[in-house]
Swiss-Prot record:
Necessary for normal cell division and for the maintenance of normal septation. NCBIfam families: GTPase_YsxC. Keywords: Cell cycle, Cell division, GTP-binding, Magnesium, Metal-binding, Nucleotide-binding, Septation. The lineage of its organism: Bacteria, Pseudomonadati, Pseudomonadota, Gammaproteobacteria, Pasteurellales. Its cofactor is Mg(2+). Coiled coil: none annotated. Mg(2+) binds at residues 42, 64. One of its GO terms (biological process) is division septum assembly. This is Probable GTP-binding protein EngB. Belongs to the TRAFAC class TrmE-Era-EngA-EngB-Septin-like GTPase superfamily. EngB GTPase family. GO terms for molecular function: GTP binding; metal ion binding.
Length: 205
């Protein structure tokens, strides 16, 4: 069997939804990108797709309040979920987002994996752990990307990856941890390979 590989550079914007009920039909395959506001989700999507402005990066954390869908190829979609956990967002809105994220992870049939992005210097905050827990309890595989890895030396980076790998063992799910830096092109290939492995299951179903 030939190796399954999608060309992420062909990814294009599909649509935005204010909540899970406005999403397109639950079909094909989706992989979600989740993370705290300013964890670097948009930057990671832009690096993966080699498009500077595919996902709008914002200097204001909490700006991305919509669910944004991108199509790699027909039936293969990437989903940019609203950033969570930013203090300047009203409490009511934060709770609403968390409810929506939980609903999406637990009820979206075409969701096949979750990429959770965390700043390598501040990983595994409460809401990050909540996201991992939701994903694992929904039998979804998880890739934890420790972003902004260029901010640490190589030895500090390796140490932090090891620490996070040990810290997530109690979750007991299919959780992989990798360092990532859009700026220094660290981890982009690993991200693409993981997405391919998740997407390829559509062919075997």
């Amino acid at each position: 069997m030939t190796e399954f590989k999608l060309n992420y550079h062909k990814t294009h914007f599909m649509t935005s939804a204010a909540n899970i009920h406005q999403l397109p039909k639950d079909e094909g395959m989706e992989i979600a990108f989740a993370g705290r506001s300013n964890a670097g989700k948009s930057t990671a999507l832009n690096a993966l797709t080699n498009q500077k402005n595919l996902a709008r990066t914002s200097k204001t954390p909490g700006r991305t309040q919509l669910i944004n869908l991108f199509e790699v190829e027909p039936q293969y979609k990437l989903v940019d979920l609203p950033g969570y956990g930013y203090a300047a967002v009203p409490e009511q809105m934060k709770l609403q987002w968390q409810k929506s994220l939980g609903e999406y992870l637990q009820h979206r049939e075409c969701l096949k994996g979750v990429v959770i992005l965390m700043d390598i210097r501040h990983p595994l905050k409460d809401l990050d752990q909540q996201m991992i827990e939701w994903a694992v309890s929904s039998d979804l595989p998880v890739l934890l990307l420790l972003t902004k890895a260029d901010k640490l030396s190589q030895s500090a980076r390796s140490k932090q990856v090891k620490t996070v790998r040990e810290a997530i063992l109690p979750f007991q799910g299919d959780v992989q941890v990798e360092a990532f830096s859009a700026q220094n092109k660290i981890g982009i290939d690993k991200l693409a390979a993981k997405l391919d492995s998740w997407f390829s299951s559509l062919l075997t179903e």
